[in-house]
Amino acid sequence: MPSIGFVAPLLPGKTETDRAAMVSCWTGDRTADFERSRKNLGITREAVFIQSTPQGDLAVVYWEADDVEAAFADMATSDDPFDRWFRDHVRDVHGINVEDGFPPPEQIMDYRA
């Protein structure tokens, strides 16, 4: 299964906003919409971690998807109400406009036993 990991810096003061939103997607009132969105986008696994650093907090994201590039592109253009909310959330807490594209990270290692 194709996968990708990436980080997105959290804007100052936005860590708790992001934490609450991600919990609402995972186990809260947005779970059904989140699951429908990810199914429609072909994302089969999504994990999000918050990493504190001296320079500020980061969201560390891991995706598995049938087609990672298509999932990013479809998320950026989807008219689904949840996907629109999610893009607004990303803009609010990370300062990233998903619609502008997101360059993939360079993978430099992939160990598997």
Q: What do these predicted ranges mean?
A:
Residues 5-9, 45-77:
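Short, well-ordered beta-strand segments in beta-rich or mixed alpha/beta enzyme
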Residues 97-113:
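Short, low-order "capping/linker" segments at domain edges
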